[in-house]
Amino acid sequence: MQFKNALTATAILSASALAANSTTSIPSSCSIGTSATATAQADLDKISGCSTIVGNLTITGDLGSAALASIQEIDGSLTIFNSSSLSSFSADSIKKITGDLNMQELIILTSASFGSLQEVDSINMVTLPAISTFSTDLQNANNIIVSDTTLESVEGFSTLKKVNVFNINNNRYLNSFQSSLESVSDSLQFSSNGDNTTLAFDNLVWANNITLRDVNSISFGSLQTVNASLGFINNTLPSLNLTQLSKVGQSLSIVSNDELSKAAFSNLTTVGGGFIIANNTQLKVIDGFNKVQTVGGAIEVTGNFSTLDLSSLKSVRGGANFDSSSSNFSCNALKKLQSNGAIQGDSFVCKNGATSTSVKLSSTSTESSKSSATSSASSSGDASNAQASVSASASSSSSSSKKSKGAAPELVPATSFMGVVAAVAVALL
């Protein structure tokens, strides 16, 4: 097999001249045109004498194993895909790829070695159902996506300090990751990986969006600001401790974490959008949000909690729904908050196991009743239906997960009670 676009005549002549007149036959740079495709090791051997290749290189076809020798830089992208017989690949001399490193649909690939790779724009590893090892010396990258692989470790990314996108999903044998990331300018997402995934992002100070699903343990020891949305959905976390976090710019969602019994956000003062805590069956005492002062959207807290401490709350620009099945929960403090004008949206609902209070803030009528009065049923019925939608949508099937799990969502802000529920429901689809 031949390259679709072979080395340029200039590069070949350069190599020949060096072979005739020098002790080395390695040209400093070889151009492969805009792009070239290699379907055999013999094709790769033609450029093995180059320290730099210019252009986009694609490797595909029936290769049992393949290697790029001597090449230190690719001024372009390297794509390895759709090779049903490729079992291993190595390019241990490459230090820099100015474009992307793409590996996709390599069904028997067990190892990929880029031991010297320090810089790349993006790495995309998708549908690698046999891979067990992937090694790099990565220091700089903009985007990392690892999806549908059998990797047990992604330590090849552990030294990265900053990225735009870090998305690790549907890797069923991946159970732990310890990161050195300090900032994420677009999104950090972990979802549908191993059943007992343990994560540590203790150097992370700032992120734009964070969404975690199907995680067993998480540590954010230094996180201070989330510029947009923060979501913890369908996890098996026993606790959440984000004690350095002071601001979430848009929505904060803690939904369907069945084993969560403690949430500590002791320095959080501002949630810029919707704020929802829902369907966390073991979360009986919610006292870790006692410094929250403003919520820029709606607020919803539903579950079986007996204690809810929002003692610093001064302003909710949307509606409010507080619904506990525990008869030990008291609405008194929240009703006082509403009567003082802090709830600025179109409705206020507060229920416990025995009483219900519903207020249509757009009108002058207010009703309180025992055991679900008619006015409360009207106002909170839609909320119950919406919350059921949240619960029903909290997981979707994934072909590579052991259990049904959904893709990581982008959570959006809301400006009313129904808005925040609808926003989270849409996000979880």
UniProtKB/Swiss-Prot annotation:
<feature type="glycosylation site" description="N-linked (GlcNAc...) asparagine">
    <location>
        <position position="56"/>
    </location>
</feature>
<keyword id="KW-1003">Cell membrane</keyword>
<keyword id="KW-0472">Membrane</keyword>
<keyword id="KW-0134">Cell wall</keyword>
<feature type="glycosylation site" description="N-linked (GlcNAc...) asparagine">
    <location>
        <position position="227"/>
    </location>
</feature>
<keyword id="KW-0597">Phosphoprotein</keyword>
<dbReference type="GO" id="GO:0098552">
    <property type="term" value="C:side of membrane"/>
</dbReference>
<comment type="function">
    <text>Required for proper cell wall integrity and for the correct assembly of the mannoprotein outer layer of the cell wall. Important for apical bud growth.</text>
</comment>
<feature type="glycosylation site" description="N-linked (GlcNAc...) asparagine">
    <location>
        <position position="241"/>
    </location>
</feature>
<feature type="modified residue" description="Phosphoserine">
    <location>
        <position position="339"/>
    </location>
</feature>
<feature type="glycosylation site" description="N-linked (GlcNAc...) asparagine">
    <location>
        <position position="279"/>
    </location>
</feature>
<feature type="propeptide" description="Removed in mature form">
    <location>
        <begin position="407"/>
        <end position="429"/>
    </location>
</feature>
<feature type="glycosylation site" description="N-linked (GlcNAc...) asparagine">
    <location>
        <position position="267"/>
    </location>
</feature>
<comment type="similarity">
    <text>Belongs to the SPS2 family.</text>
</comment>
<feature type="region of interest" description="Disordered">
    <location>
        <begin position="361"/>
        <end position="410"/>
    </location>
</feature>
<feature type="glycosylation site" description="N-linked (GlcNAc...) asparagine">
    <location>
        <position position="234"/>
    </location>
</feature>
<dbReference type="GO" id="GO:0005576">
    <property type="term" value="C:extracellular region"/>
</dbReference>
<keyword id="KW-0732">Signal</keyword>
<feature type="compositionally biased region" description="Low complexity">
    <location>
        <begin position="361"/>
        <end position="401"/>
    </location>
</feature>
<keyword id="KW-0336">GPI-anchor</keyword>
<keyword id="KW-0325">Glycoprotein</keyword>
<feature type="glycosylation site" description="N-linked (GlcNAc...) asparagine">
    <location>
        <position position="209"/>
    </location>
</feature>
<feature type="lipid moiety-binding region" description="GPI-anchor amidated glycine">
    <location>
        <position position="406"/>
    </location>
</feature>
<feature type="signal peptide">
    <location>
        <begin position="1"/>
        <end position="19"/>
    </location>
</feature>
<feature type="glycosylation site" description="N-linked (GlcNAc...) asparagine">
    <location>
        <position position="21"/>
    </location>
</feature>
<protein>
    <recommendedName>
        <fullName>Cell wall protein ECM33</fullName>
    </recommendedName>
</protein>
<feature type="glycosylation site" description="N-linked (GlcNAc...) asparagine">
    <location>
        <position position="196"/>
    </location>
</feature>
<feature type="glycosylation site" description="N-linked (GlcNAc...) asparagine">
    <location>
        <position position="328"/>
    </location>
</feature>
<feature type="glycosylation site" description="N-linked (GlcNAc...) asparagine">
    <location>
        <position position="304"/>
    </location>
</feature>
<dbReference type="InterPro" id="IPR036941">
    <property type="entry name" value="Rcpt_L-dom_sf"/>
</dbReference>
<keyword id="KW-0449">Lipoprotein</keyword>
<dbReference type="GO" id="GO:0005886">
    <property type="term" value="C:plasma membrane"/>
</dbReference>
<keyword id="KW-0964">Secreted</keyword>
<dbReference type="InterPro" id="IPR051648">
    <property type="entry name" value="CWI-Assembly_Regulator"/>
</dbReference>
<keyword id="KW-0961">Cell wall biogenesis/degradation</keyword>
<feature type="glycosylation site" description="N-linked (GlcNAc...) asparagine">
    <location>
        <position position="82"/>
    </location>
</feature>
<dbReference type="GO" id="GO:0071555">
    <property type="term" value="P:cell wall organization"/>
</dbReference>
